Amino acid sequence: WRTRAERFDELVVDAAQDLARRWPPVDQIQFAVEEVPPSDPAPWERSVVLGRGFTAEPRAGLPARVVIYRRPVASRATNDAELADLVHRVVVEQVALMLGRRPEEIDPGSAP
């Protein structure tokens, strides 16, 4: 038996591993889950932030990082299948932004 939070974490890991098999640079990105964004959206972000990407900071020893926000993502899904699909799409979007690619290039099956 796993909690909802553990199942959500597993969905993020699965999406990241799936992308890393096809896009080796994804292996260099650290993935994390947080409950909610720590601040209000930046002016360029949509009203509710589902995920954020942070570039690597080699001087500080910090790898590139993608954070997926569990509550905003989970609140948009009505069932487990929708949740899995949405988590995958948010991970793809964030990875695409970090790699300077379109989401369709990263994962052709995730086009909106």
Segments (PLM) and residue ranges:
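A metal-dependent hydrolase signature that marks the N-terminal structural subdomain at the beginning
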Residues: 1-58, 64
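DNA-recognition helix of helix-turn-helix
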Residues: 93
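Active-site scaffold of zinc-dependent metalloenzymes
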Residues: 49-88, 98-112
